[in-house]
Amino acid sequence: MAELRAAQAEDVSAIAAIDPLGLGRLEEIQALVRDHACLVAAERGEIVGFLALKPGHFYKRDFIDLTFVAPRWRRQGVGRALMRAALRNASTSRVFVSTNDSNMPMRELLRSEGWAPSGVLSGLDEGDPEHVFFHDVSAG
């Protein structure tokens, strides 16, 4: 299983390489790492996934803003491990996350991990509504 740890400055380029929009949001990734809001999953030193947990970002609740796993590491428990680590590191009793309607693997992961639907937002990505979920940290 991949090692989970806080992202370091030297991880930024590897994180950006996993994110399909990584180069377009390089400054955002750098800020997340600088603010200690980014976890990475590493396998034999290679960054294979990352997650950004923004404390108090969503109506004063923690929000998982970005979660990406490198394509060849998907469906191997990396995303699940990152999500569980985010809950362990949460600073609020309830954590929120959102994903596009088209992202069935993420929606299935969230449901299997006990995340509850909170609502649907339209108008963010044309034709692909955003599903919002929450997890009560105290519930495990």
What is the predicted role of each segment?
Residues 2, 6-65, 70-71, 83-84, ...:
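Acetyl-CoA-dependent GNAT
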Residues 39-42, 131-136:
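Short beta-strand element of the conserved SAM-dependent methyltransferase core
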Residues 69, 75-88, 108, 112:
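Conserved acetyl-CoA-binding loop-helix of GNAT-fold acetyltransferases
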Residues 70, 74-75, 102, 125:
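Glycine-/small-residue-rich active-site loops that bind phosphorylated ligands and cofactors
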Residues 89-101:
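Conserved GNAT acetyl-CoA-binding A-motif
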Residues 96-98, 114-132:
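Conserved catalytic-core motifs of GNAT/GCN5-like acyltransferases
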Residues 138-140:
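Short, charged/polar, Gly/Pro-enriched secondary-structure boundary elements
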